[in-house]
Amino acid sequence: MGKYNLVLSEYLSFVYNSQSAVQIPIYYSSNSELEKRCIEFHAKCVDSSKKGLSLKPLFEEYKDVIDNATLLSILSYSYDKYNAVERKLVNYAKGKPLEADLTANELDYENNKITSELFQSAEEYTDSLMDPAILTSLSSNLNAVMFWLERHSNDVADANKIYKRRLDLFTIVASTVNKYGVPRHNEKYRYEYEVMKDKPYYLVTWANSSIEMLMSVFSHEDYLIAKELIILSYSNRSTLAKLVSSPMSILVALIDINGTFITNEELELEFSDKYVKAIVPDQIFDELQEMIDNMRKVGLVDIPKMIQEWLVDCSLEKFTLMSKIYSWSFHVGFRKQKMIDAALDQLKTEYTEDVDGEMYNEYTMLIRDEIVKMLEVPVKHDDHLLRDSELAGLLSMSSASNGESRQLKFGRKTIFSTKKNMHVMDDIAHGRYTPGVIPPVNVDRPIPLGRRDVPGRRTRIIFILPYEYFIAQHAVVEKMLLYAKHTREYAEFYSQSNQLLSYGDVTRFLSSNSMVLYTDVSQWDSSQHNTQPFRKGIIMGLDMLSNMTNDPKVAQTLNLYKQTQINLMDSYVQIPDGNVIKKIQYGAVASGEKQTKAANSIANLALIKMVLSRIANKYSFITKIIRVDGDDNYAVLQFNTDVTKQMVQDVSNDVRYIYSRMNAKVKALVSTVGIEIAKRYIAGGKIFFRAGINLLNNEKRGQSTQWDQAAILYSNYIVNKLRGFETDREFILTKIIQMTSVAITGSLRLFPSERVLTTNSTFKVFDSEDFIIEYGTTDDEVYIQRAFMSLSSQKSGIADEIASSQTFKNYVNKLSDQLLVSKNVIVSKGIAVTEKAKLNSYAPVYLEKRRAQISALLTMLQKPVSFKSNKITINDILRDIKPFFVTSEANLSIQYRKFMPTLPDNVQYVIQCIGSRTYQIEDSGSKSSISKLISKYSVYKPSIEELYKVISLREQEIQLYLVSLGVPPVDAGTYVGSRIYSQDKYKILESYVYNLLSINYGCYQLFDFNSPDLEKLIRIPFKGKIPAVTFILHLYAKLEIINYAIKNGAWISLFCNYPKSEMIKLWKKMWNITALRSPYTSANFFQD
């Protein structure tokens, strides 16, 4: 057992270093004799520590425990109160504290003034502009850094250089924080007025960002970038990130392509040795120079110098530094503005009469036609989803806020809640539920707002619309997305696509006679000019569609959708400004509708099509691809002559002119070799991703606990690492130690061990080896997993009370009755479970469950209860398989070139040997025939877990299940009687196992699991026809081999002689695998 436990025990002696502090390790074992010794050992330790005796003799006496049992947790006593941080910090505060430039930002409150200057009193004060929104404190972060520095103060050679660099940067942070004193957080990890009033307002969030940056410093270049960003972000809280990352949009156009990967007809990436020269007009260089000058104006020195030096020969090798700067710039933290400024930002756009009406008209028509094209087929066929749109909307209703808090009665319990699902239930119970009436959002009922904060951009506002808007839009949007799924233009939704294929799409058509036009249209999406043509285009499309149907239900669905658009054309928003709530007419499109993503994509596609049709009047070219991806669109144009500087410049200016005729403030660029969009950038024929996920500051507070956030922190660290921004792993482990500790009393804390946090259980937080997901198969691992399973499902009294109320029951019955043709307990129970799960987002329920779980965990971490479970986990299956595998050394040579330069070496090596995966492995069961059959007749979407349960039932029961969901008895009978059904059994099992093994997350999503190179390392003699068993054996072998290769940079081959007698046993077991949900899996899901 590795590094974590070592770091843990050292950390504890670092933090609790007084005379009175004691650490008692707690061990456990699955061996009952040894377990008795573990219990004795613990009892004696507690006894000795009460008497104030040393524990050393006990460690000698119980050496067998320490050597053979597994560490479960460490119990830590400490009586001294926590001012330890301040005491230690003084030793590092040897430098000159930073002084904020109080004129650095346009908006007064974005300057880092002393809090009492920004907010005169506690009543006025809000922490919303600087709230780190993470369940860990500045003092913990400081402790973690000082712990690292102390541990490494004696490092030698290169390690010592890293130490010195970090020490130097920490001196800046320590001196500045020490000058004002470390702000104390309250129990919710927030910083109150009393604490902050005599300190700079942004001190905490700045210090968090700075710590995150300095703990990511390795090389001298990292040090220079970090130092500059740390110092300048203390004053500049508004534009720094934007200034530093702006040049990238031009840099990608400067590197020649010399060999690249392209997407071929089979949708695979294949290498192409083409050479494409970067053709760059002088005008572009002038723009770049201007960006660099702007950087210098705000005091940046080293970063612009690095860019300037790179520009001398624009080499791909040195481009990693550019991509590093681009990633680092995001780590200065979120830009959080006041809501009033975020809202007024869009409204400041001045209207000009001088716009090209004809262009607006063409834009509107293109939107109209696209809407019609998307929905034509389902409307003409009276699709059941469009007929039962209300039910579909209710089934997928979220538990997000509905915009206002209401008093609701559930049985005898009265609660206050803002949640949509609860409002729906309450309205239905009181006859107020009228989905046929879309409430207006005009001056009488202005829209409450949410916010979205992002580094390097201004705050954006989000509409929190009444639930009627969701119900009205849901079904139609689902149909739109279904169309987008098989339309390549929609890069974000296209089914076979992923980021790698989109990359190959662009490089495929780049050549000496083509250019690529890429535009960031985020400004346009939220501009006032877009509103009327956008909504009108949608309304006109819906009107045309209404004439294509005779079904009143479909017509009603389209009509309600149209009503949402009409209402939103006259929208008012309510913005808290100080103590008053202002009502403002808001004439722009904002996020918050169900249609946001789909409709924006449609509009952006219409926009670029219109631009291309305009420049086609002047140039002769073929449009090879048009793509839209979120806020960005791009197109590759092929001319009949080689591209020259003059052509690039002309096309560029013409495109910009066209946009300006529409008053669209967008950033349009033309290049011959690369593009830069929000999600990815292509330079020198290689693909890059921005590693900009903040670790120690979060965008907003949700209802996740410290454990969840520890898992999210780790998951963010992994994503950044795959994208080329690495934070010291030891620091991340220290943060996990801090965030997963559980306080028992003021002076007693329990720290879980590595085994607890990495075992695949409901408490899993991280992997003991980055990028490798291990499924423990030893006795102790399975034992602890069983123990945790016994306490995983926690009850909540509040939830039970709500669920047993008439209001809740009536709602679930209403849904069941509308959905089912005949009663079916599986579906009804499924709905009830889903609805009850939605109650989790109601804080009191969540807290209650969590409290129960923590207290159970506390008991468990002090003495695990052995527990005979009939549940089977994926670990049990792998444990059965493992003994039959024999390992031998093997050899695979590197045969693929690199196309993602930012990957860590070990991951890069595996990809270069076995190739990369350009598709998502289907892990939802949606490709199975039964799933398709259900969606043909019903709006109900069973989860992979439900399909897995259903498909293993008796044939009679499957038939009843299908019939109850509205599948005609004939079809249901045919299905069960055919071979398709047995194929489905296999397909669904396969999907389920892939889902359990997180094959589409982390770095596994990059590897080609069907690589012939991988297959040839596996030898499994074929015995009998049980495809499911063959599948699991092969998958296990592949994971073993890949994990070994990631860890050791070498290959093994596996031989498996699985006895035929065992196969049937294994097959039966495979139908009872329980899925485990943990903070770790939800963090993975959260990345999605």
Swiss-Prot record:
<keyword id="KW-0696">RNA-directed RNA polymerase</keyword>
<dbReference type="GO" id="GO:0044423">
    <property type="term" value="C:virion component"/>
</dbReference>
<keyword id="KW-0946">Virion</keyword>
<dbReference type="InterPro" id="IPR043502">
    <property type="entry name" value="DNA/RNA_pol_sf"/>
</dbReference>
<dbReference type="InterPro" id="IPR007097">
    <property type="entry name" value="RNA-dir_pol_reovirus"/>
</dbReference>
<comment type="function">
    <text>RNA-directed RNA polymerase that is involved in both transcription and genome replication. Together with VP3 capping enzyme, forms an enzyme complex positioned near the channels situated at each of the five-fold vertices of the core. Following infection, the outermost layer of the virus is lost, leaving a double-layered particle (DLP) made up of the core and VP6 shell. VP1 then catalyzes the transcription of fully conservative plus-strand genomic RNAs that are extruded through the DLP's channels into the cytoplasm where they function as mRNAs for translation of viral proteins.</text>
</comment>
<protein>
    <recommendedName>
        <fullName>RNA-directed RNA polymerase</fullName>
        <ecNumber>2.7.7.48</ecNumber>
    </recommendedName>
</protein>
<dbReference type="Pfam" id="PF02123">
    <property type="entry name" value="RdRP_4"/>
</dbReference>
<dbReference type="Pfam" id="PF12289">
    <property type="entry name" value="Rotavirus_VP1"/>
</dbReference>
<keyword id="KW-0694">RNA-binding</keyword>
<keyword id="KW-0547">Nucleotide-binding</keyword>
<dbReference type="GO" id="GO:0019079">
    <property type="term" value="P:viral genome replication"/>
</dbReference>
<dbReference type="InterPro" id="IPR001795">
    <property type="entry name" value="RNA-dir_pol_luteovirus"/>
</dbReference>
<comment type="subunit">
    <text>Interacts with VP3 (Potential). Interacts with VP2; this interaction activates VP1. Interacts with NSP5; this interaction is probably necessary for the formation of functional virus factories. Interacts with NSP2; this interaction is weak.</text>
</comment>
<keyword id="KW-0460">Magnesium</keyword>
<keyword id="KW-0808">Transferase</keyword>
<keyword id="KW-0548">Nucleotidyltransferase</keyword>
<dbReference type="InterPro" id="IPR042032">
    <property type="entry name" value="RNA-dir_pol_4-hel_dom"/>
</dbReference>
<dbReference type="GO" id="GO:0003723">
    <property type="term" value="F:RNA binding"/>
</dbReference>
<comment type="similarity">
    <text>Belongs to the reoviridae RNA-directed RNA polymerase family.</text>
</comment>
<dbReference type="GO" id="GO:0000166">
    <property type="term" value="F:nucleotide binding"/>
</dbReference>
<keyword id="KW-0693">Viral RNA replication</keyword>
<feature type="domain" description="RdRp catalytic">
    <location>
        <begin position="501"/>
        <end position="687"/>
    </location>
</feature>
<dbReference type="InterPro" id="IPR022071">
    <property type="entry name" value="Rotavirus_VP1_C"/>
</dbReference>
<dbReference type="GO" id="GO:0003968">
    <property type="term" value="F:RNA-directed RNA polymerase activity"/>
</dbReference>
<dbReference type="GO" id="GO:0006351">
    <property type="term" value="P:DNA-templated transcription"/>
</dbReference>
